[in-house]
Amino acid sequence: MQTLKCVVVGDGAVGKTCLLISYTTNQFPADYVPTVFDNYAVTVMIGDEPYTLGLFDTAGQEDYDRLRPLSYPSTDVFLVCFSVVSPPSFENVKEKWFPEVHHHCPGVPCLIVGTQIDLRENKMVIEKLQRQRLRPITPEQGEKFARELRAVKYVECSALTQRGLKNVFDEAIVAALEPPVIKKSKKCTIL
């Protein structure tokens, strides 16, 4: 049985662990426990073939910046996560996570994953964001961002309601099995 390695990265508290636990157990975890490093495995059928999907959870906190890349070797696909109700975590996809992943694993496919979409319509969350002159990230913003960063795709989900959750991992599997061909830009040479 072939194994696919999927590593999940993103800021602390954006829902990476909940995403993985909800997907692998069909239950939303009750408590928040910051992750240092964890991994999970699920068997998925793709056509008639069984695959083991190895899911690697990582710590988003800066304290683990030197430790986290130790989980990167042999990765088949990255899920770069942010919370749709945390614009700073969205910015960090571009400022921190994409550069880190591409530095350590150039050419490995990446999906951008918007998490916590159930909170996008939450009145208390919206009011809190408005007090900071912020608003939730829209699907259109996520899709545009994915194009700009040349990610494979933008997907979003809620680990709480499981809306879009299976699709995130289905798309990750497709990206791992059929990585997109990276078009090299033509370099200008002056003689």
Curated annotation (Swiss-Prot):
Keywords: Cell cycle, Cell division, Cell membrane, GTP-binding, Lipoprotein, Membrane, Methylation, Nucleotide-binding, Prenylation. It is found in: Cell membrane. It is a lipid-anchor. The keyword Metal-binding does not apply. Residues 189-191 form a propeptide. Involved in development of cell polarity during the cell division cycle. Required for the establishment of actin polarization in germ cells. The gene is CDC42. A motif (Effector region) lies at residues 32-40. It comes from Eremothecium gossypii (strain ATCC 10895 / CBS 109.51 / FGSC 9923 / NRRL Y-1056) (Yeast). CDD domains: Cdc42. Belongs to the small GTPase superfamily. Rho family. CDC42 subfamily. A lipid is attached at residue 188 (S-geranylgeranyl cysteine). This is Cell division control protein 42. GTP binds at residues 10-17, 57-61, 115-118. GO terms for cellular component: cellular bud neck; cellular bud tip; fungal-type vacuole membrane; incipient cellular bud site; mating projection tip; nuclear membrane; plasma membrane; septin ring. GO terms for biological process: actin filament organization; budding cell apical bud growth; budding cell isotropic bud growth; conjugation with cellular fusion; endocytosis; establishment of cell polarity; invasive growth in response to glucose limitation; nuclear membrane organization. The modification Cysteine methyl ester is found at residue 188. GO terms for molecular function: GTP binding; GTPase activity; protein kinase binding. InterPro entries: Cdc42, P-loop_NTPase, Small_GTP-bd, Small_GTPase, Small_GTPase_Rho. The keyword Transmembrane does not apply. NCBIfam families: small_GTP.
